[in-house]
Amino acid sequence: TTGRRIPVYFHSEHRQIPRLRELNPNPLVEINPQTAQKLGIVDGQWCRVYNQFGEAYLKAKLTASVKPDVIHAQHGWWFPEEDGNAPHNYGVYRSNINNLIPNFHVGKLGFGAPFKCMLCNIEGTNENFDTDMQLIQDKFGELR
């Protein structure tokens, strides 16, 4: 499922506030421990979530609150500490779960995409995208 609101942020806002970023420094994908074990994914491992439309990299959080064979991704991620110039654009596409939905398929009443879930694959990766909290502090101020 996609679009879970993150309690420490307001949608995509406040990633540049050091104290909030310390509470939730990386984009997470929640996965049931049984599913994770079956796929060889361990808690805290970076994962590639993908389908025929695109991919996103998120960090695994094992939790029994998600049903087996279902994953739940946080939304709204971008990295204000990174380069904002095109094509990088603050890393907005690296961990954007909306990469996995088809573009330009909108609801009849507006321009919002009517997707709350999508078929996808998930695999562990050896890549490391952990947030450098020292960089956050240097760029945006002390952690308080």
Descriptions of predicted regions:
Residues 15-144:
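Long, contiguous, secondary-structure-rich segments that constitute the structural scaffold
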Residues 1-16:
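Long, low-complexity segments enriched in small/aliphatic residues
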